Amino acid sequence: MRLLILFLAVVTLLSLAGPGSAEVRRRRRRPPCEDVNGQCQPRGNPCLRLRGACPRGSRCCMPTVAAH
């Protein structure tokens, strides 16, 4: 009986912690592109540009160079 209660407690705790941690991971994911001196460039993988992941003026761009 104690083992069953312990098992249910562990399952309950894991189910409560699961969705929140996935949402945090999803929020931290960086976009595939970045804004480099006003131009949208792929971040890391050069193949992203060939697949059209960085269309000009797209929302995926994030400014990395501060405007002076």
UniProtKB/Swiss-Prot annotation:
Q: State the organism's lineage.
A: Eukaryota, Metazoa, Chordata, Craniata, Vertebrata
Coiled-coil annotation reads: none
Q: What's in the domain note?
A: The 4 N-terminal Arg residues do not affect the overall fold, but are important for the antimicrobial potency.
Intracellular or extracellular location(s)? Secreted
Where mainly found?
Answer: secreted
> What UniProt keywords are attached to this protein's entry?
Antibiotic, Antimicrobial, Defensin, Disulfide bond, Secreted, Signal
Q: Quick one: signal sequence residues?
A: 1-24
Kindly list the GO CC terms recorded for this protein: extracellular region
GO terms (BP aspect): defense response to bacterium
Q: Which Gene3D superfamilies match?
A: Anthopleurin-A (2.20.20.10)
The organs and tissues expressing this protein are described as:
Highly expressed in intestine, liver and spleen and expressed at lower levels in brain, kidney, lung, testis and venom gland.
Out of the domains of life, which is the source? Eukaryota
**InterPro entries reported in the protein's UniProt record:** DEFBL_dom (IPR049528), Myo_ane_neurotoxin_sf (IPR023355)
Q: What Pfam families does the annotation carry?
A: Defensin_int
The name of this protein is: Venom-like beta-defensin
Give all cystine bridges in this chain: C33-C60, C40-C54, C47-C61
Q: What does this protein do?
A: Potent antimicrobial peptide that displays activity against S.aureus and P.aeruginosa. Does not inhibit growth of E.coli.
